Structures are given as structure tokens and as C-alpha cells.
């Protein structure tokens, strides 16, 4: 036994319990905590006591923490900061909710209509306070609500309102309604008109077995073909539904022989009028307009619009008038109802309308005619409801027959032409004549169309989206083997003119076909008969060496279509007397108002180059659409420009609001004067497929100041029927592309010298050249106008006085600068009377 054990066993035997003092302590504080051994540490063997900590010094006691009060300064600052943060979050949230509800949401209005076939019309439906009207309105509104509250636009749908319930010529009820959506402005771009209309149309369940257009819309029998839904204006919604009904009136007409007047006028304030016209079932409405007094601004503010419905639905527009007129015009509906809206929100002078409407029966446009056996015209055919504008979707059928196989049928039109139909379709009616397709187009002269057959079937299908101009033609028979009389020339227009008028320098055929493929006559300068060569006499060009062809040109002679007429009705032979710098008329009228191109000596050129110098072409204008250069134009007065009609073709481009004119500009973006465009006047006969009548006038909102006359000047308008000679040098200018393959236009104004091309060569190259066009360029293809130059000037300098003449307007061509394909320009001299109609100050 070791020493330690021996000491314990050797305890005194007299030891008593009373001698032992016991100290009780907390076991939790004093007892050692049993912890697992650390890695690598050996546990004590069983039966062996663990080593004891030496008992020498007692462990010092921990000092107890001092209790700190909760509401001290530091905690108060923290709590106050948290409170301010929470308050700021709440304020920003409320502000965001307010803005999102008030400023960031827009209302979208849609006007529509459809026909319910299983409900018969009752007279009580005309009274909007009647139980019958309220009942059917409630039913329709519930159906529309169900359609859109279960659609993808459900969270944006606001309400639907039935505006009118009317009869119609197809039976049942024709319901007109508004649908209103409200959505955040940021999402407005995804809200499409076609999407809204598709939801309504797709909700109509049609039967495949019955193959009918009538289907079920939540229990309503709706004609699918009658469904129309277009985006509308808030002002139209307010004036037809809301409290701002203005001068809205409802007319129900049931007497055929009466004229129901529509007259309203005001000298100040505003006019926002809606006239709802309804006729008895089975009849149509004809509106006749005597006069309109409005501000001419392309219907931006003032307008008169005629609808084939009782709500202002865009796709049901029959016609829109944007200019004042005193010429009688009449329009016919396709159903027994019509809406006429007159708007003049800012009346500066007297505005108003004088018109009347009447109830007329439907007409069938068909006839069978047995033509006489003698040649000549004997009767007339016309468009439906002539002389009214004929409605869209009309159809006419005529059958002509002659008893002789040697005779064919001829149609003589007064302002219309029929040509072979192309792949592009027809804008003003398509014709099927003996199973051949043709297109119709309007023009300002007569044409004759011949069918070499004794039996002719003709069908006219009205293809215009709007009501179109009245159409009148004479019919008769002709000799198939000899269409024109002996001694006559047959024009490409179908007309017959005396052979003596061929190649006489006068456009007798109206299409210049009598002046093509002519050998230029040489004047007999040394004989007394040289006066018979009219085109070469007094034309401003010296054809005789002795100048005899240009002598005695201002001697008074009887007036004809080749003479110049002074203000006092005196005529002489001089062809281009207007504004040539020489006073030829006794009253000086030939030089009145000639302020164009006054500073020609100040013009600088870089011959052979491409860039111009600043002020080089002071009549050149850059037209910007929505801020970007789009077309060119020419200054012809202080507030009028001349350009090409194709620059403004279409609904968006014809609106003057997005257009601005940049004058006195050399580098794009550095114009000396910029003005919004107030008005765009496109020629009424413009043909977007052939580019015929490709001319337009633009009126500036602000006239350019006289202080800029060194950098901005009008170019001279040519005299009516001005003759030009092939090979004459002219200049085409613009900011268009330098090459056909370029992606963008030039920043610096470009110029190119071109030659006028012989009209016969021009027609031979393109084939579809009219007398209102001319060709210019270089046949090698080195110089030409290009994309972006459209509407810009073709400027030619007159030798007699050095003034610059606006000979042409950049119109079209085959590519740009291609060999053997010169550019095609609008011949301005053919439109001088049309220009004077709108700009009389140039007279």
C-alpha cells in the first residue's frame, strides 16, 4: 500500500462527528461541469484519482453588472430614427398609390356596333327613357361586360354603354355602343384596336353546319359580319354619351318627298354638333350639302364628317370635308341611317353648314341595252345615285349588244379612265369587261374605252373605302375595223383628232400621244410660209439664223390656245411672256407679281461637284416628319411650298401636324427658319399606283420673314403649257441618298446637273409616262435624284432673263442613277391653273 493510502487509514481513532463543520454551497456554481475530453487527452485510469488543482489562492469573484435604464438618450435616438424611416416609407407608398391612380392611367374609348337578329325593332327603342330601350340596353351591356371581364383585358375593363338602338334594312336591331378601358399609361402601347375587336368577335359562337354569319353571343343572335369596333375619341364619347352633348340632334324621316333642313352657324365660340339621321326601313338617306364654312387645315380642327352609322366609327366614314366649299355635293348611305358631325372648336370667323337630307329608295344599278346599228354615241350610263357621290361596296352590271358583228361598244368618260389591272389592285373601282379585269382612275380630261365585240358584259365593283366621285359615261357603237373617221388620228386616250393636228406642238389628245414620235420640223426661215410651224415660233428659242422665228412676237393677234393673254384681253404669239423680265403687255400684266428668283446672280455653284454652297438654292426646303427628314419641297411664296403628292399618301402622312418645313438650310439641323405645316393639299386626281398627278401644296403656319430674303427666295412657276427642249441643262437638289445602296441621306445639300430627256424616249423607256410627267437625267446613269429627294425641285435657268424656273418635281423612277433609266418628274407647267386656285397671289 502506498504512502497516501497509509495516511488515510492512519486517521485518529478518537475523531467525532461533532468536530466536523459542514459548508453548504450551490452545486450549480461550485461543482465542476463534466465536459467531454479533448481530442488527444488521456482519461484517468479507473481507480486512480485525477490530479487535484493546488489549493493555494482563491479565485476572485466577478463584479456584478450595473443596471442601465432602458429610456436612455442612445435608445431614444435609435427609436426616433426607426420611426422616421417607417413614416417615410408610408408617405412614399401613399404618394405612389396616388400618382398611379391619378396621373399614370389613361382611358381608352372604343365605338362599335353589331346587329342582333332575334329581336325585332320596336318604335319605343327610339326613346332612351323608355322601359324597352333600358331593358335591351341592360341586356347588351351585361353581355359585353361578361365578354371582357373574362378576357385578357379584364383588369383594364371599365364599362360599356349602349348609345343607340335602331332599325336597319337587314332586319333585327342595330346596336351602337361604347366600351371604356382604363390602364396605366406605361402599358398603353400594348393596347391594340384589333385585339379588342378580336375578343368580341371570338366570343360569337357560329355553327359550322349551317354555314351562316349569325352566331350566339351569350344568348344573343349576332351577325358576325356586322361587328365593327374602332378606337374613338374622348370628345366624341362625351358629346354622344356624356353631359357635353353640345348641339346633338336626332331626326327620324318617313316622308319621301320632303327635304329636311340641316343648318347651323356661329361667329364665335365653338361648334361640336352631331346629327343622327334615321329613315324608315327599306330606304336610304341622301345628304345634300349646299355650303360649308370652316377653317381649311386638313381636318385637324375643323371638319364635316359623314358616317354610315349612328356613332363616329372610323371604319364607317363615308366622306370627310376639310375645306370650305359652295359647290353642291350629295352623299348616299348604304343603310337607313347616317351620322353627320360638324366640328369647329375655335371659331375665328363665321363657321357653319347649310344642307338638307331626304329619304330615297334603293336603286339597282343594272341595265341591258340593245345598241343601234349606226355608229356614234346614243345614251348614258352612270354610277349609282348619280350625280351623288356613290357609296362604297356598290355594284353595277350592264349588258350591251349590237345586231352587227362588225360593230363594237365604245364608252366615253368625261373624267375617268380604264386601264389594265395590275397586281396592286384598284383604288377607284375595278371593272370586269368580257372576263378581263381593269382598274378605273379619275383625271381631268375625256377618254374613250372600246370593246371590239358585239356582245359586252360589264361589271363595276366599287372598291373605294369611302364614297367616290360621281361617274358618267356615254355609250354607243363603233366600227371595229376603223375606230376613228378617215383623216383622223387615234389617241392613246381613245379620242380621235384631225390628222392635221398631229405633231403640231399642241397636246390635242390630252395624253400627248399626238406629239410623240414626231420629227422636229425645221422652219422655212427664208419663205413667207414659215409661220405655219407654230411650235417653233416665239417659243424663246432662236431656230432661224436670222432670228426671224422670234420677231414680232408681241404683235396683237386673235386669241387662241397658243397665244399669251394679257390682263386687258390682248393676245400675242410670245409663248413664255410671264415674268421673263420684259414688259410685253400694254398694261404690264405679264410682269406683275414677279418677285421670284430675284437674286440669281448671288447663286454659287461647284460645277462638277456634289456639295453646294450655303444660299446656293434658296428655294430648297427639307420637310421633316416627326423630326426626321422625309421629303423635299420648293418655296413658291412666303407661306406656300410645292412638293410631291406621294410624300403625303396615307392617313398618317396626310396629317399636317407631324410635319415641319426647314427653310434656308444648307446642313441638316441648321435651318435659318422652321415652321410647322398648317395645311396639305394633295391633287384630287393623284394616283398612288401610277404616280400621275403627283403634286401637292403645303401652307406654312408662319410665313418666313423678309429679313431672310438673301437665304430664302421663291422659285418662279413656269407659264401654263411651257415647252421645254430635250438636252436642256437643269439641276436637281436635295438631301437624299448619294447612291442607291446608301442607308441614309446626306447631311449637306447635294446638287446634280441633269439633262431634259426627249418625251418619246421617256415613253419608250417606261411605257406609263403621261403628259403630266417628264424625264431628266443622264442616260449613262451617273447623275440622278435618289430616295429622300422626293418632292424637291428640278430647277432650270431661263436664258432670256437668268431666272430659275421650277420645271419639275422629283417623283419616281426605276432605281436611282441606273443606266438608261432617267428620273421621272412631275411637269409643273401642266398644273399652273391648279396652283393659282390655292395661291392666287402668284397670278
Curated annotation (Swiss-Prot):
Renumbered to this chain, the Basic residues biased-composition regions fall at: 56-67
Side of membrane Cytoplasmic, spans = 1-76
The segments labelled Disordered in the record are 27-67
Peptidase S1 domain mapped to chain residues = 606-840
Q: Where is the CUB domain?
A: 247-360, 365-481
Give the way it sits in the membrane. Answer: Single-pass type II membrane protein
> Cross-referenced Pfam families, in alphabetical order?
CUB, Ldl_recept_a, SEA, Trypsin
Note the SS bond partners: 247-273, 299-322, 365-396, 484-496, 491-509, 503-518, 525-544, 538-553, 559-571, 566-585, 579-594, 631-647, 730-796, 762-775
Q: What does this protein do?
A: Serine protease which preferentially hydrolyzes peptides with Arg at the P1 position.
* PANTHER family xrefs: ACROSIN-RELATED, TRANSMEMBRANE SERINE PROTEASE 7
Protein name per Swiss-Prot or TrEMBL: Transmembrane protease serine 7
Q: What is the lineage of its organism?
A: Eukaryota, Metazoa, Chordata, Craniata, Vertebrata
Amino acid at each position: 500500500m502506498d504512502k497516501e493510502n497509509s495516511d488515510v487509514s492512519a486517521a485518529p481513532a478518537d475523531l467525532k462527528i461533532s468536530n466536523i463543520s459542514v459548508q453548504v454551497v450551490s452545486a450549480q456554481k461550485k461543482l465542476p461541469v463534466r465536459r467531454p475530453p479533448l481530442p488527444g487527452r488521456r482519461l484517468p485510469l479507473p481507480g486512480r484519482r485525477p490530479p487535484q488543482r493546488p489549493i493555494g489562492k482563491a479565485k476572485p469573484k466577478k463584479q456584478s453588472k450595473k443596471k442601465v435604464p432602458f429610456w436612455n438618450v442612445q435608445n431614444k435616438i435609435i427609436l426616433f430614427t426607426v420611426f422616421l424611416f417607417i413614416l417615410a416609407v408610408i408617405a412614399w407608398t401613399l404618394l405612389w398609390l396616388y400618382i398611379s391612380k391619378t396621373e399614370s392611367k389613361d382611358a381608352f374609348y372604343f365605338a362599335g356596333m353589331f346587329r342582333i337578329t332575334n329581336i325585332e325593332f320596336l318604335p319605343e327603342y327610339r326613346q332612351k327613357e323608355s322601359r324597352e330601350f333600358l331593358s335591351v340596353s341592360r341586356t347588351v351591356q351585361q353581355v359585353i361586360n361578361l365578354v371582357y371581364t373574362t378576357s385578357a383585358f379584364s383588369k383594364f375593363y371599365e364599362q360599356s354603354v349602349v348609345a343607340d338602338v335602331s332599325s336597319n334594312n337587314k332586319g333585327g336591331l342595330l346596336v351602337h355602343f361604347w366600351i371604356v378601358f382604363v390602364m396605366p399609361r406605361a402599358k398603353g402601347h400594348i393596347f391594340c384596336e384589333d385585339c379588342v375587336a378580336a375578343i368580341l368577335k371570338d366570343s360569337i359562337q357560329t355553327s359550322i353546319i349551317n354555314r351562316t354569319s349569325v352566331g350566339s353571343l351569350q344568348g344573343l343572335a349576332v351577325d358576325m359580319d356586322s361587328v365593327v369596333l374602332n378606337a374613338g375619341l374622348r370628345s366624341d364619347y362625351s358629346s354622344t354619351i356624356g353631359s357635353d352633348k353640345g348641339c346633338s340632334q336626332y331626326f327620324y324621316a318617313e316622308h319621301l318627298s320632303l327635304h329636311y333642313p340641316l343648318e347651323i352657324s356661329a361667329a364665335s365660340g365653338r361648334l361640336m354638333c352631331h346629327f343622327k339621321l334615321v329613315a324608315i326601313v327599306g330606304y336610304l338617306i341622301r345628304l345634300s350639302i349646299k355650303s360649308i364654312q370652316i377653317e381649311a387645315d386638313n381636318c385637324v380642327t375643323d371638319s364635316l364628317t359623314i358616317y354610315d352609322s349612328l356613332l363616329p366609327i372610323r371604319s364607317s366614314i363615308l366622306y370627310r370635308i376639310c375645306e370650305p366649299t359652295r359647290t353642291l355635293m350629295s352623299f348616299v348611305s348604304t343603310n337607313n341611317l347616317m351620322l353627320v358631325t360638324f366640328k369647329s372648336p375655335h371659331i375665328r370667323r363665321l363657321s357653319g353648314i347649310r344642307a338638307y337630307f331626304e329619304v330615297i329608295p334603293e336603286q339597282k344599278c343594272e341595265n341591258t341595252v340593245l345598241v343601234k346599228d349606226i355608229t356614234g354615241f346614243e345614251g348614258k350610263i352612270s354610277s349609282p345615285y348619280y350625280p351623288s357621290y356613290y357609296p362604297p361596296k356598290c355594284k353595277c352590271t350592264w349588258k350591251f349588244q349590237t345586231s352587227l358583228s362588225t360593230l363594237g361598244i365604245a364608252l366615253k368618260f368625261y373624267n375617268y379612265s380604264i386601264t389594265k389591272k395590275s397586281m396592286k389592285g384598284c383604288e377607284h373601282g375595278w371593272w370586269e369587261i368580257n372576263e378581263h379585269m381593269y382598274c378605273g382612275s379619275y383625271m381631268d380630261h375625256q377618254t374613250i374605252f372600246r370593246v371590239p365585240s358585239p356582245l359586252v358584259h360589264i361589271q363595276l365593283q366599287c372598291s373605294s373605302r369611302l364614297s367616290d366621285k360621281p361617274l358618267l359615261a356615254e355609250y354607243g357603237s363603233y366600227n371595229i375595223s376603223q375606230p376613228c373617221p378617215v383623216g383622223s388620228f387615234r389617241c392613246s386616250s381613245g379620242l380621235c383628232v384631225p390628222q392635221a393636228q398631229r405633231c403640231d406642238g399642241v397636246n390635242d389628245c390630252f395624253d400627248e400621244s399626238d406629239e410623240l414620235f414626231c420629227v422636229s420640223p425645221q422652219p422655212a426661215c427664208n419663205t413667207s410660209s414659215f409661220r405655219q410651224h407654230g411650235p417653233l415660233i416665239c417659243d424663246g428659242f432662236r431656230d432661224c439664223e436670222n432670228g426671224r422665228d422670234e420677231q414680232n412676237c408681241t404683235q396683237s393677234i386673235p386669241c387662241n390656245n397658243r397665244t399669251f393673254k394679257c390682263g386687258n384681253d390682248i393676245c400675242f404669239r410670245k409663248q413664255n411672256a410671264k415674268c421673263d423680265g420684259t414688259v410685253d403687255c400694254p398694261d404690264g400684266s405679264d410682269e406683275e407679281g414677279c418677285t421670284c428668283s430675284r437674286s440669281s446672280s448671288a447663286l454659287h455653284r461647284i460645277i462638277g461637284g456634289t456639295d453646294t454652297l450655303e444660299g446656293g438654292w434658296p428655294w430648297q426646303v427639307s420637310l421633316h416628319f416627326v423630326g426626321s427628314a422625309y421629303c423635299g419641297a420648293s418655296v413658291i411664296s412666303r407661306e406656300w411650298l410645292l412638293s410631291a403628292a406621294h410624300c403625303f399618301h396615307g392617313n398618317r402622312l396626310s396629317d399636317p401636324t407631324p410635319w415641319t418645313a426647314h427653310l434656308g438650310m444648307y446642313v441638316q439641323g441648321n435651318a435659318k427658319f422652321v415652321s410647322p405645316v398648317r395645311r396639305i393639299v394633295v391633287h384630287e386626281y393623284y394616283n398612288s399606283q401610277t404616280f400621275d398627278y403627283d403634286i401637292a401644296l403645303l401652307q406654312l403656319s408662319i410665313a418666313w420673314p423678309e429679313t431672310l430674303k438673301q437665304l430664302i427666295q421663291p422659285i418662279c412657276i413656269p407659264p401654263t403649257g411651257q415647252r421645254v427642249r430635250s438636252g436642256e441643262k437643269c439641276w436637281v437638289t436635295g438631301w437624299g441618298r448619294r447612291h442607291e445602296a446608301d442607308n441614309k441621306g446626306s447631311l449637306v445639300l447635294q446638287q446634280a446637273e441633269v439633262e431634259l430627256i426627249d418625251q418619246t424616249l421617256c415613253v419608250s423607256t417606261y411605257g406609263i409616262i403621261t403628259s403630266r410627267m417628264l424625264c431628266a437625267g443622264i442616260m449613262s446613269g451617273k447623275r440622278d435624284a435618289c430616295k429622300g429627294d422626293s418632292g424637291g425641285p428640278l430647277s432650270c435657268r431661263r436664258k432670256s432673263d437668268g431666272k430659275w424656273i421650277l420645271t419639275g418635281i422629283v417623283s419616281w423612277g426605276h432605281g436611282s442613277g441606273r443606266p438608261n433609266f432617267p428620273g421621272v418628274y412631275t411637269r409643273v407647267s401642266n398644273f399652273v391653273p391648279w396652283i393659282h386656285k390655292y395661291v392666287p397671289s402668284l397670278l
